[in-house]
């Protein structure tokens, strides 16, 4: 089969935003105008196409990133048919892992902002993630029909609060209830979408007199921004004091692809105004797979050579699995982005991350949760394979002969844990299967067993995250379970350097056990991790026992010394010891190292570390005092306060242990008018009285 759409007509775009900016509604309109849905789905009535899990439809939030393929020829049919692969990402901070995964495989993004709330707390988190992967983006200021809407104010906030460089490509005609349409600054015409056909058609008129001055001013700014793209455009602009429409588009595109500017658009997705122009902007200003740097990976040779993979059907096949989902009808779905080459159904691929061969049986292109079966995928495609057994998120799938590992994704450590137990014997087996599948889908969710109590412990990124996991066990896997109180994942660390030795000797008739080590145990900078150094001279401990010493140290680190929490950020140096020709073995050295570390750490002034959360609260000014008082009561430290259109924004660091049930408390002290976001910031030493209480409770 030949390629049906040339690569330069592909756009892989993520829709990213704050939780209530109207992101899913925007995506729904894109599907309507590109002809993929005939009935508009609305989030508020629970029928949105992209929100296909039951919990999403009930809670009105997007949890998983649904991927959809659609085609667009432009508002006036002015383009060749372009293939747009859209990924709708969740906006809630507990699901930032989903955002991170999808940004990794996209070429560009459309950032949706609320015209009233502007840059809200979650916008900053998502923006940072897009910066990390250097994703070019356009901005869409949505909800222009709402009270307090202001397009240019939001553009200013993007500059001051996100450090972006927004360039308005339109200005709004009216706002709030009188929002009618937009002025397209390139053509300098007013665009009004027809409400009769849900905005499928539009008419252009002259710019209203009262907006001509503002339009001229913004036009000049846009032209100057375009002229800065390269010397050729700058010379033209300086000579003629203007640029042609073609040159403006060229300059804006060049700078947007380099992430130097963010072309900005506005509208109301709910009122069917403006989304069509955003689709045009994706085609005009966002990159195709050919416009972004070739992805690089490490080849499967002993030198681990770095090799690029160009977006080209003739290159060897390489793809990245970025999401696993369990579908009630077909089982496991592995979403993957093809970077190079061609893959046909029935082909074998090599999973270079796991060192295993996989046969690709059926492949589907997803339209939200509807599946179109396909026979092949090519460079630039996003598709899903059915029934792959050993593939997990972040794995590389590649050609059997030309092996490559694309960079792995990094996932955050969970910060909150819950004990879950099945209600009946019948639920027990089902719960094991359910948790296994859910953990395969979501790398920020972990399952473990408490060795002492035998309880199953689930851990994740926040209360909502674990709520939804438990909810899914009931709905999708029919598992009833009891849930314990949330547990905080503490850590332990040392504050001073110690040197200590331990000799492990055991005689019990016949061959004995002998291991003897001297360890220097030192604290490291927070976040540095564990370092093991071998300074043995003259063979006082034979080399073959060193891995056992290292293992003994690491096993003891898992269990800490204060309250059984993992010990972090230490450097352990083996600098002396002794061995016995007959009685020494790996087990003896492992035990000696483990006991030496345990005793040494107790002398190194150990302390308990607690997870601190970066909390941002947006509250009406009337409740400011109560909100601040509540944060202080929770041992929080306020770091910044800022005036916002909707009131005041408070930024603080608060211990996670004090944040349980915060959403209900905040709702009651502000009568439901404040909202907040929270994400893990760092581990810091818990105050002595708090640490003593925790240690005493856990050591009972």
Swiss-Prot record:
Predominant place of localization: cytoplasm
Pfam hit, one: EFG_IV
PROSITE patterns linked: G_TR_1, G_TR_2
Residues that bind GTP: 17-24, 88-92, 142-145
Domain tr-type G: 8-290
Compartments (UniProt record): Cytoplasm
GO molecular function: GTP binding; GTPase activity; guanosine tetraphosphate binding; translation elongation factor activity
Record-level GO BP terms: ribosome disassembly
InterPro entries reported for this sequence: EFG_II, EFG_III, EFG_III/V, EFG_IV, EFG_V, EFG_V-like, EFTu-like_2, G_TR_CS
Keyword vocabulary terms for this entry: Cytoplasm, Elongation factor, GTP-binding, Nucleotide-binding, Protein biosynthesis
Domain of life, source organism: Bacteria
GO cellular component terms, semicolon-separated: cytoplasm
PANTHER family in alphabetical order: RIBOSOME-RELEASING FACTOR 2, MITOCHONDRIAL (PTHR43261:SF1), TRANSLATION ELONGATION FACTOR G-RELATED (PTHR43261)
Functional description taken from the UniProt entry: Catalyzes the GTP-dependent ribosomal translocation step during translation elongation. During this step, the ribosome changes from the pre-translocational (PRE) to the post-translocational (POST) state as the newly formed A-site-bound peptidyl-tRNA and P-site-bound deacylated tRNA move to the P and E sites, respectively. Catalyzes the coordinated movement of the two tRNA molecules, the mRNA and conformational changes in the ribosome.
Family in the record: Belongs to the TRAFAC class translation factor GTPase superfamily. Classic translation factor GTPase family. EF-G/EF-2 subfamily.
UniProt protein name: Elongation factor G
Gene name of the record: fusA
């Amino acid at each position: 089969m030949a390629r049906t759409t040339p690569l330069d007509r592909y756009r892989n775009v993520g829709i990213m935003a704050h939780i209530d900016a109207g992101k899913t509604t925007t995506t729904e309109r894109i599907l309507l105008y590109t002809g993929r849905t005939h009935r508009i789905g609305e989030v508020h009535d629970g029928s949105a196409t992209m929100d296909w899990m039951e919990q999403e439809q009930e809670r009105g939030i997007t949890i998983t990133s649904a991927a959809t393929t659609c085609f667009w020829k432009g508002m006036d049919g002015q383009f060749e048919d372009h293939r747009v692969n859209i990924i709708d990402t969740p906006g809630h901070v507990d699901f930032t892992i989903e955002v991170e995964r999808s940004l990794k495989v996209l070429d560009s993004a459309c950032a949706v902002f609320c015209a009233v709330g502007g840059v809200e707390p979650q916008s900053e988190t998502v923006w940072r993630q897009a910066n990390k992967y250097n994703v070019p983006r356009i901005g869409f200021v949505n909800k222009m029909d709402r009270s307090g809407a202001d397009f240019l104010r939001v553009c200013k906030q993007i500059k001051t609060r996100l450090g972006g460089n927004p360039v308005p490509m339109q200005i709004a005609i009216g706002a709030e209830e009188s929002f009618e349409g937009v002025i397209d600054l390139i053509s300098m015409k007013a665009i009004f979408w027809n409400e009769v056909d849900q905005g499928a058609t539009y008419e252009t008129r002259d710019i209203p007199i009262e907006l001509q001055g503002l339009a001229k001013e913004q036009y000049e700014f846009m032209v100057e921004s375009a002229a800065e793209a390269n010397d050729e455009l700058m010379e033209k602009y300086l000579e003629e004091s203007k640029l042609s429409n073609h040159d403006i588009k060229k300059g804006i595109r060049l700078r947007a692809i380099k992430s130097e500017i963010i072309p900005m658009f506005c509208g109301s997705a709910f009122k069917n105004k403006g989304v069509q122009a955003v689709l045009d902007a994706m085609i005009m200003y966002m990159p195709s797979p050919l416009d972004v740097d070739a992805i690089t990976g490490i080849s499967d040779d002993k030198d681990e050579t770095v090799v690029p993979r160009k977006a080209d059907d003739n290159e060897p096949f390489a793809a990245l699995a970025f999401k696993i989902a369990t579908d009630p009808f077909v089982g496991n779905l592995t979403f993957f982005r093809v970077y190079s080459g061609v893959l046909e159904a029935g082909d074998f691929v090599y999973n270079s991350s796991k060192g295993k061969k996989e046969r690709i049986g059926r492949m589907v292109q997803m339209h939200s949760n509807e599946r179109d079966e396909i026979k092949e995928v090519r460079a630039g495609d996003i598709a899903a394979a059915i029934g792959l057994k050993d593939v997990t998120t972040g794995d590389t799938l590649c050609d059997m002969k030309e092996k490559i590992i694309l960079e792995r994704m990094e996932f955050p450590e969970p910060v909150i844990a819950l004990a879950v137990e099945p209600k009946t014997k019948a639920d027990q087996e089902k719960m094991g299967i359910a948790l296994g599948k859910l953990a395969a889908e979501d790398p920020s969710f972990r399952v473990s067993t408490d060795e002492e109590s035998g309880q199953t412990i689930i851990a994740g990124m926040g209360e909502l995250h674990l709520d939804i996991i438990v909810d899914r066990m009931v709905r999708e896997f029919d598992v009833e379970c009891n849930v314990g109180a949330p547990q905080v994942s503490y850590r332990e660390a040392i504050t001073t350097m110690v040197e200590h030795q331990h000799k492990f000797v055991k005689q019990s008739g016949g061959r004995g056990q002998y291991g003897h080590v001297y360890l220097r145990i030192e604290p490291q900078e927070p976040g540095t991790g564990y370092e093991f150094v071998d300074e043995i001279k003259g063979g006082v401990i034979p080399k073959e026992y060193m891995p056992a010493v290292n293992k003994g140290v690491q096993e003891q680190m898992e269990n800490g010394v204060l309250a059984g929490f993992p010990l972090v950020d230490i450097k352990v140096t083996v600098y002396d010891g002794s061995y016995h020709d007959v009685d020494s073995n790996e087990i003896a050295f492992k035990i000696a190292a483990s006991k030496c570390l345990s005793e040494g750490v107790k002398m190194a002034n150990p302390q308990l570390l607690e997870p601190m959360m970066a909390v941002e609260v947006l509250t009406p000014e009337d409740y400011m005092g109560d909100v601040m008082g509540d944060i202080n009561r929770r041992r929080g430290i306020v770091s910044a306060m800022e005036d916002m259109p909707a009131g005041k924004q408070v930024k603080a660091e608060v211990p996670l242990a004090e944040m349980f049930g915060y959403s209900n408390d905040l709702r009651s002290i502000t009568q439901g008018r404040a909202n907040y976001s929270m994400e893990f910031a760092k581990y810091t030493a818990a105050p002595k009285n708090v640490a003593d209480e925790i240690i005493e409770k856990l050591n009972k």
